[in-house]
C-alpha cells in the first residue's frame, strides 16, 4: 500500500515555509509549542464567538507566529478580514488582550497584524470550512464538493482534489468519496501544493475532509 506523507511537511524548505518561527532550548521546546497552540486556539475561539459571516465561516487561512526575546509577532492571514477590521482598533486590541491573558506574558510585547489573502477560495482551510458548513446544513456531499471546485476555479488554481470520509449522508457503513479536477502532482516536490485536513461534526457522526490544491509549479 502507498504510504501517504503530509504534503506540507514533505515540501518544507522548498515551496512551503514554517508557520512558527522561533528558537528554544531543547528543554523549553515543548513549552514554546504549547504556547503556539494556545495562541492559535485563542484567536480561533475569539473569531468564532465574535464574528460570523452569513455563511458561518471564520475565513482564517493560517496564523504565523514569530517570537523574539521581547516580542511575539502574530500575523493572521484571513480571506475576509473586514470582519475583524470593521471597528479595527477595538477588535484587534480586544483580541490582543485576550491572547495576553491566555499566555500570561508580562515581560513580552504582543503584536497582532491582519493580512488579507487575494484569493480566499484558493486556500484549502477556507474551502474546508465552506464544505463543513454545507454538510452541517445537510446539503448533499457531491453538491458541496462540486461547489467547492467551482469556487477554486475562480481563484486560478491548476488542480484540486477533495476527499470526504465517514458516514456520508447518514449511511450505516462509513466510506470515502473523492473528486479531482485538473492536475494534483503529489510526488513532485517543486509543485506548490496546499493541503488541509479537518473534521466536521454532523448529526450522524464525524466526517473527515481533506483538500489538496495545486497552486503553481516553481
From Swiss-Prot:
Residues 47-118 form the KH type-2 domain. Disulfide bonds: none annotated. InterPro entries: KH_dom-like_a/b, KH_dom_type_2, KH_sf_prok-type, Ribosomal_S3_C_sf, Ribosomal_uS3_bac-typ, Ribosomal_uS3_C, Ribosomal_uS3_CS. One of its GO terms (molecular function) is structural constituent of ribosome. It is found in: Plastid, Chloroplast. GO terms for cellular component: chloroplast; cytosolic small ribosomal subunit. The keyword Zinc does not apply. GO terms for biological process: translation. It comes from the Eukaryota. It holds the Pfam family Ribosomal_S3_C. Keywords: Chloroplast, Plastid, Ribonucleoprotein, Ribosomal protein, RNA-binding, rRNA-binding. CDD domains: KH-II_30S_S3. Belongs to the universal ribosomal protein uS3 family. PANTHER family: 30S/40S RIBOSOMAL PROTEIN S3, SMALL RIBOSOMAL SUBUNIT PROTEIN US3C. Part of the 30S ribosomal subunit. This is Small ribosomal subunit protein uS3c. It comes from Crucihimalaya wallichii.
